[in-house]
Regions:
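Short helix-initiation/N-cap motifs at beta->coil->alpha
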Residues: 13, 28-41, 82, 99-102, ...
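Flexible hinge/capping segments at coil-to-helix
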Residues: 69, 78-95
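Periplasmic-binding protein-like
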Residues: 70-78, 103, 141, 145-192
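A ligand-binding cleft/hinge motif common to bilobed small-molecule-binding domains
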Residues: 39, 51-61, 108-109, 130-163
Length: 192
């Protein structure tokens, strides 16, 4: 995620820094809309996506995923003053989500009475919650838990929603050299 100072933060950034160090290069970060993660790989705009990327069968048809490095489910963060602790509390309310995410898929399928307010960028979605443009925000639970820790007045009332999914880096289909390197790094970091 991007913090208040405009700096990239989170495990993906830590992992990218480690990959770059071991490759002997400086990482070049590209801000990517969640819905465009596959497109930036297939169009050769980036070599690797480390953007809290959930492995799905549909995505596997277009990109190659490395070994997973995290398991997640969905979480829901809301203001402490109007905390959401159950999906049923969202009926008739506005839920902020990022386009192209598993949260979008889950709520479109399972919560037809929830009004979805969709944003291209995570930063815009978080800002919408800060500004009170929605009642809550949903994305991967690791993301909302980290965000709520650094944003006073907000709390994750639903910490585990939907299926457990895996998060993994992705490379262009057929880029076995980079895929193998990333897989080796994941194994190495797991030992560290």
């Amino acid at each position: 995620y991007v913090d208040k100072d405009g700096k990239y933060q989170g495990y993906d950034v830590y992992f990218a820094e480690q990959l770059a160090k071991d490759l002997g290069v400086e990482p070049e970060y590209t801000s990517v809309d969640p819905a465009a993660r596959v497109d930036v790989l297939t169009s050769n705009k980036v070599d690797l996506v480390l953007a809290n990327f959930t492995v799905t069968d549909e995505r596997k048809e277009k990109v190659d995923f490395a070994k997973p490095y995290m398991k997640v489910a969905l979480g829901v963060v809301s203001p402490e003053s109007a905390q959401i602790t159950d999906v049923s509390q969202l009926d008739g309310k506005t839920l902020i989500i990022a386009k192209g995410t598993t949260a979008e898929t889950f709520f479109e399928k399972n919560a037809p009475n929830v009004k979805l307010q969709k944003y291209d960028q995570y930063a815009d979605a978080y800002n919408a919650l800060l500004d009170g443009r929605g009642d809550a925000f949903s994305t991967d639970n690791t993301e909302v838990l980290a965000w709520a820790k650094s944003n006073k007045g907000f709390k994750v009332g639903i910490t585990h929603l939907g299926d457990d999914d895996t998060i993994a880096p992705a490379v262009q289909k057929g880029n076995t050299e980079l895929l193998n390197f990333v897989n080796d790094e994941i194994v190495k970091l797991g030992k560290d």
